[in-house]
Amino acid sequence: MGQNDLMGTAEDFADQFLRVTKQYLPHVARLCLISTFLEDGIRMWFQWSEQRDYIDTTWSCGYLLASSFVFLNLLGQLTGCVLVLSRNFVQYACFGLFGIIALQTIAYSILWDLKFLMRNLALGGGLLLLLAESRSEGKSMFAGVPTMRESSPKQYMQLGGRVLLVLMFMTLLHFDASFFSIIQNIVGTALMILVAIGFKTKLAALTLVVWLFAINVYFNAFWTIPVYKPMHDFLKYDFFQTMSVIGGLLLVVALGPGGVSMDEKKKEW
């Protein structure tokens, strides 16, 4: 009974949090979600020559193609961020940002680095949720018009987004025998499964937001490293990519799990 009371209290807190923040939570979620693209686009501007030289050296593609790659990254990411934040042509912005992820995955050889590949896939999951949200906003203009129960593409995008988001947490698991690591892995894995299958989704996603934010601030504190050290850029990249996944989880909290989830199926039972 005590355990049920604790779970009930936690769910009440999550519902209360959502009621208080429902006006601005989607805005915060979108800002967090695009933060890695915004930071990377700005970095392309300030590190133009370094990025160009890296691409030229890695792919031997020449000055012109390397410069075009950097320009495409800069323009594509900053334009996509502006469109998402202004809620204009959000679907096109998402497709453009998907393209940037794919381009960077190949150009920076992320395809062969499992950890970074999983984080890029998690970032793609956040964009899928943003795409689903934009479809919801588009359909809301036709409120009252008879439609099917729910758009299948939208609910499957939400499912795919949830599943991809949890890949981020698989990169945080620690495979050692310490008591703290074992507890952290058990709790983290349980929360990941809950989000993926859509059970107690808002509470599980909100808990993961708090946990991931704490880990991010502790392990990726780039502001404590001098700017001239390579570790500064590495931690900054990691920090903002993690913030983007947090943004995706906040979208799950704000929008719910969608039609393909245990929470929705419970309503039919």
Swiss-Prot record:
Keyword Transport (UniProt): yes
Keywords: Endoplasmic reticulum, Golgi apparatus, Membrane, Protein transport, Transmembrane, Transmembrane helix, Transport
Record-level GO BP terms: COPII-coated vesicle cargo loading; endoplasmic reticulum to Golgi vesicle-mediated transport; Golgi organization; lipid export from cell; lipid homeostasis; lipoprotein transport; positive regulation of organelle organization; regulation of lipid transport
Keyword Endoplasmic reticulum annotated: yes
GO molecular function, one term: COPII receptor activity
Primary localization: endoplasmic reticulum
Recorded GO CC terms: COPII-coated ER to Golgi transport vesicle; cytosol; endoplasmic reticulum exit site; endoplasmic reticulum membrane; endoplasmic reticulum-Golgi intermediate compartment membrane; Golgi membrane; nuclear membrane
Segments carrying motif Di-lysine motif: 266-269
Compartment list: Endoplasmic reticulum membrane; Endoplasmic reticulum-Golgi intermediate compartment membrane; Golgi apparatus membrane
UniProt-listed InterPro entries: Surf1/Surf4, Surf4
Transmembrane segments: 65-85, 92-112, 179-199, 203-223, 242-262
Record's bilayer topology term: Multi-pass membrane protein
Disruption phenotype: Embryonic lethality between 3.5 and 9.5 dpc. Conditional deletion in the liver depletes plasma lipids and protects mice from atherosclerosis.
Quaternary assembly: Found in a complex composed at least of SURF4, TMED2 and TMED10. May interact with LMAN1. Interacts with ZFYVE27 and with KIF5A in a ZFYVE27-dependent manner. Interacts with STING1. Interacts with SAR1B. Interacts with TMEM41B.
UniProt domain comment: The di-lysine motif confers endoplasmic reticulum localization for type I membrane proteins.
Main function: Endoplasmic reticulum cargo receptor that mediates the export of lipoproteins by recruiting cargos into COPII vesicles to facilitate their secretion. Acts as a cargo receptor for lipoproteins bearing both APOB and APOA1, thereby regulating lipoprotein delivery and the maintenance of lipid homeostasis. Synergizes with the GTPase SAR1B to mediate transport of circulating lipoproteins. Promotes the secretion of PCSK9. Also mediates the efficient secretion of erythropoietin (EPO).
Similarity field: Belongs to the SURF4 family.
Name of this protein: Surfeit locus protein 4
Species assigned in the record: Mus musculus
Lineage: Eukaryota, Metazoa, Chordata, Craniata, Vertebrata
